[in-house]
């Protein structure tokens, strides 16, 4: 009996996109400060994979991207994985439970993912005893990063959707409705 699961082409596309985005994030984006903060598009990637592919692939992508980030930046191993797994899972659950198709969904999910990533990572670092000053500067950085990531959410959503759309299985809830055609016999066409 053949197991049903995501197509291999979808998994390959997710892996290639994740590796590319993480390397671009670490090599290019993080080197260009905007408003005194470094932009982090990794939570956006994880949230949008979850929003397009569901909770299982969202959580797996979150774990893999978080582990890759932790390994490349030599951070506390598994901390980013934990936070990104939660982000991917809940974005996927949003898709499975509500099927959001509003135009503002990518902005709201992107803002929530950025806030969850920043607050979650800061909280876990504080709980692990990392000596970092907790002040209004940290709050300013969190707010600015959430705002900037929310602004970047729409372009990131378009990129992730464009890369993954050809491999996504057809979802019966998202079928396009055909316009009713009369074969040219419409009374409006005679005018």
Regions flagged by a language model, labelled:
Residues 1-191:
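Terminal, non-globular segments
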